[in-house]
Curated annotation (Swiss-Prot):
Mg(2+) binds at residues 201, 203-204. The basic functional RuBisCO is composed of a large chain homodimer in a 'head-to-tail' conformation. In form I RuBisCO this homodimer is arranged in a barrel-like tetramer with the small subunits forming a tetrameric 'cap' on each end of the 'barrel'. The active site is at residues 175, 294. It comes from Draba nemorosa. The modification Phosphothreonine is found at residue 330. The modification N6-carboxylysine is found at residue 201. Substrate binds at residues 123, 173, 177, 295, 327, 379. The record marks 334 as: Transition state stabilizer. This is Ribulose bisphosphate carboxylase large chain.
Length: 479
């Protein structure tokens, strides 16, 4: 042993490895109002006790490392360390546990989702002592929430900008998603908007490819917006995807959209990254643009029940980072989505205060302290027969987005848009008259078909279409 090492040992530094639970498992800890709280689904390797696994998560996502280091003595671990303060079993899963971890607020940079996630969902997810790890929920304290701008505008400001109230908004993703020229793309946008939709949308992978450069697309879509507005007397929009290979290029595209006078742009927030998304959100607030968010890549992160991150966490992160709309599944369409879980994170997107409710997957009470809300977007494999269920599930503060369910109409895009608008108006009127959409939905649609040939044709085309597959990511305790 060198003299230097002997000196360190003689003043209290004890080298070596000790169990994480001796430092980071603190069941007596009382959480603070300023703590960020996390609920992890932990699957320990065989032979690893749940207390050690939970403590390892707390350590490796905060101040700990695999061995004792002498620099621990140069700071206050009690002030900065994460703490596993409670562990509970998962019903029906012998090898899984929910570990609750509290993080001191000083561990995180203000206004940075990037920094928060780098710690909480960083290297710890590759830790060998864990067979699997999933972040189920986060409690963001008001003290941290107040360091974020959040959505550029929010639900009420968007409705005021669009002058549209008392119903869900209607959208359509232009198909085929790739391969159209800019002029043909703009024509498809125009037909949908003049038929009665509020919005059309770039698909998430439409950026600036050889068949359609972004500037050309923006110009033809702006022409479609202005022409359809003049004909219908309604404010229209198209989600112009500003996502690009660099933040500088992304902002350049948003600037051009603003110069064209269009109301909304779009970003792929997971593939683009949280830093880019927050930058774009700030630009949109400063320049009066709404911001639509697509969640491409989310299922890589959130679909498996025992590893990754639940979408409710990604939804909370988006509300902090900023976006006025975000795709949130449909429950009834072609994409994965458990009903109760979906309703839970839809409330987390829209409401100012959400109580803990484990029956909907909400582990913590969340106070958003007046941070603007986000409109959930229902999109993916939906058509006119789904309209009653969508209206009942998502309510007025939502965007119902039909891609193939508009463009697949046998008579073309505009009649497809008419069919969706008629179906929506019929459902809203029936609901306002006190009818039960869950029970009478099909009857309501059939009645509307009698005076709308466009809706009748759509109903005939999609009458047999179902996406009846079991949900992979169910809430605990569901069969």
């Amino acid at each position: 042993m060198s003299p230097q090492t002997e000196t360190k040992a003689s003043v209290g530094f004890k080298a070596g490895v000790k169990e994480y639970k001796l430092t980071y498992y603190t069941p007596e800890y009382e959480t603070k109002d300023t703590d960020i709280l996390a609920a992890f689904r932990v699957t320990p390797q065989p032979g690893v006790p749940p207390e050690e696994a939970g403590a390892a998560v707390a350590a490796e996502s905060s101040t700990g490392t695999w061995t004792t280091v002498w620099t621990d003595g140069l700071t206050s671990l009690d002030r900065y360390k994460g703490r596993c303060y409670h562990i509970e079993p998962v019903p029906g899963e012998e090898t899984q546990f929910i570990a609750y971890v509290a993080y001191p607020l000083d561990l995180f940079e203000e206004g940075s989702v990037t920094n928060m996630f780098t710690s909480i969902v960083g290297n710890v997810f590759g830790f060998k002592a864990l067979a699997a790890l999933r972040l189920e929920d986060l409690r963001i304290p008001p003290a941290y929430t107040k360091t974020f701008q959040g959505p550029p505008h929010g639900i009420q400001v968007e409705r005021d900008k669009l002058n549209k109230y008392g119903r869900p908004l209607l959208g359509c993703t232009i198909k085929p998603k790739l391969g159209l020229s800019a002029k043909n793309y703009g024509r498809a946008v125009y037909e949908c908007l003049r038929g009665g939709l509020d919005f059309t949308k770039d698909d998430e992978n439409v950026n600036s490819q050889p068949f359609m450069r972004w500037r050309d697309r923006f110009l033809f879509c702006a022409e479609a917006i202005y022409k359809s507005q003049a004909e219908t007397g309604e404010i229209k929009g198209h989600y112009l995807n500003a996502t690009a290979g660099t933040c500088e290029e992304m902002i350049k595209r948003a600037v051009f959209a603003r110069e064209l006078g269009v109301p909304i742009v779009m970003h792929d927030y997971l593939t683009g990254g949280f830093t880019a998304n927050t930058s774009l959100s700030h630009y949109c607030r400063d320049n009066g643009l709404l911001l639509h968010i697509h969640r491409a890549m989310h299922a890589v992160i959130d679909r498996q029940k025992n590893h990754g991150m639940h979408f409710r966490v990604l939804a909370k992160a988006l509300r902090l980072s900023g976006g006025d709309h975000i795709h949130a599944g449909t429950v009834v369409g072609k994409l994965e989505g458990d009903r109760e879980s979906t309703l839970g994170f839809v409330d987390l997107l829209r409401d100012d205060y959400v109580e803990k409710d484990r029956s909907r997957g909400i582990f913590f009470t969340q106070d958003w302290v007046s941070l603007p809300g986000v409109l959930p977007v229902a999109s993916g494999g939906i058509h006119v027969w789904h309209m009653p269920a969508l209206t009942e599930i998502f309510g007025d503060d939502s965007v119902l987005q039909f891609g193939g369910g508009t463009l697949g109409h046998p008579w073309g895009n505009a009649p497809g848009a008419v069919a969706n608008r008629v179906a929506l108006e019929a459902c809203v009127q029936a609901r306002n008259e006190g009818r039960d959409l869950a029970v009478e939905g099909n009857e309501i649609i059939r009645e509307a078909c009698k005076w709308s040939p466009e809706l009748a044709a759509a109903c005939e085309v999609w009458k047999e279409i179902r996406f009846n597959f079991p949900t992979i990511d169910k809430l605990d305790g569901q069969a």
